[in-house]
């Protein structure tokens, strides 16, 4: 869920001021919800806005000070980057997973490697898969593929 993006402290302060409609130095869940709708075009329920506030509300007052708001924005940016990375990994996984089985087999790995100009035999492909095959089933699931790509 996108909250906002602020690259510098000045931008963070300006963004905080935009979200702080009543100018009291705190952002309520209602202000957060309203600003997410009007500024970002993102609909969130009262409950979701409350959960967002609670996720970074260090002092437990139900409101966000500027530092808490900055933490919320930073967390949203990390989440967004993780989503982008996950989409890219899913697409890459799909290139190797050619047999419609939802996993990368030694055969599908060999096919893709050949397309990329590498002439690995099936035993080499089994050995590559074995290094990241955590459950020992002889194939790579998407989760195992993610681990391999992040290694």
From Swiss-Prot:
Pfam families with a match to the protein in the record: EF-hand_7 (PF13499)
SUPFAM superfamilies (UniProt xref): EF-hand
Cross-referenced PANTHER family: EF-HAND CALCIUM-BINDING DOMAIN CONTAINING PROTEIN
CDD domains on file: EFh (cd00051)
Xref: PROSITE patterns: EF_HAND_1 (PS00018), EF_HAND_2 (PS50222)
Keyword flag Metal-binding: yes
Gene3D superfamilies: EF-hand
Disulfide bridge partners, by residue number: none
Residues that hold Ca(2+) 3 according to the record: 133, 135, 137, 144
Function of the molecule: Potential calcium sensor.
Superkingdom of this protein's organism: Eukaryota
List of residues binding Ca(2+) 2: 57, 59, 61, 68
Protein name: Probable calcium-binding protein CML31
Binding site for Ca(2+) 1: 20, 22, 24, 26, 31
Encoding gene, per UniProt annotation: CML31
Residue ranges annotated for the EF-hand domain, each copy included: 14-42, 44-79, 84-119, 120-151
Keywords from the UniProt entry: Calcium, Metal-binding, Repeat
GO terms of molecular function: calcium ion binding
């Amino acid at each position: 869920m996108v909250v906002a993006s602020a690259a510098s402290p000045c931008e963070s302060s300006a963004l905080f001021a935009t979200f702080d409609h009543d100018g009291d130095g705190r952002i309520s869940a209602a202000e957060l919800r309203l600003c997410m709708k009007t500024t970002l075009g993102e609909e969130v329920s009262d409950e979701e806005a409350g959960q967002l506030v609670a996720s970074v509300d260090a002092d437990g007052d139900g409101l966000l000070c500027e530092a808490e708001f900055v933490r919320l924005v930073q967390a949203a940016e990390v989440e967004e980057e993780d989503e982008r990375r996950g989409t890219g990994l899913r697409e890459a996984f799909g290139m190797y997973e050619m047999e419609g089985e939802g996993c990368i087999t030694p055969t599908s790995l060999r096919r893709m490697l050949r397309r990329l100009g590498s002439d690995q035999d099936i035993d080499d492909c089994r050995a590559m898969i074995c290094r990241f095959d955590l459950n020992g089933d002889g194939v790579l699931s998407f989760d195992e593929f993610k681990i391999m790509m992040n290694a």
